[in-house]
């Protein structure tokens, strides 16, 4: 199973929702809080192409934010990505 990383910030409801969704489906993940870490935020923006949080990665593959994660989980694409990455 590939490593799942969720990049978050404090007081982010979409971050909480993404983490809860992953937990409810028994996906282990690492959370990286980017609050106050401008260098890390710029790196994640460059890798994901997005300026919002959360940003979810499976290995080096950007899934996107909460809405993209939710859609990918519902369609089965997320399970396939995790299994094949």
Feature roles, as predicted:
Residues 1-28:
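Local sequence-structure signature of Cys/Sec-based thiol-disulfide redox active-site neighborhoods
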Residues 16, 39, 64:
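Residues that form or flank phosphate/diphosphate-binding pockets in enzymes
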Residues 29-31, 62:
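Conserved beta-strand scaffold positions in the cores of enzyme catalytic domains, especially
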Residues 33-51, 77, 83-85:
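Thioredoxin-like thiol-disulfide oxidoreductase module
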Residues 48-57, 67:
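Structural micro-motif
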Residues 58-85:
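Non-catalytic, surface beta->alpha helical segment in thiol-disulfide oxidoreductase systems
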């Amino acid at each position: 199973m590939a490593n799942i990383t969720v990049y978050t910030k404090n007081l982010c409801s979409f971050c909480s929702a993404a983490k809860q969704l992953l937990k409810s489906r028994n996906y282990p993940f690492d959370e990286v809080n980017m609050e106050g870490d401008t260098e890390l935020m710029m790196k994640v923006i460059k890798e994901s192409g997005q300026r919002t949080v959360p940003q979810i990665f499976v290995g080096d593959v950007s899934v996107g934010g909460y809405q993209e994660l939710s859609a990918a989980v519902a369609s089965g694409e997320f399970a396939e990505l995790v299994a094949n990455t």
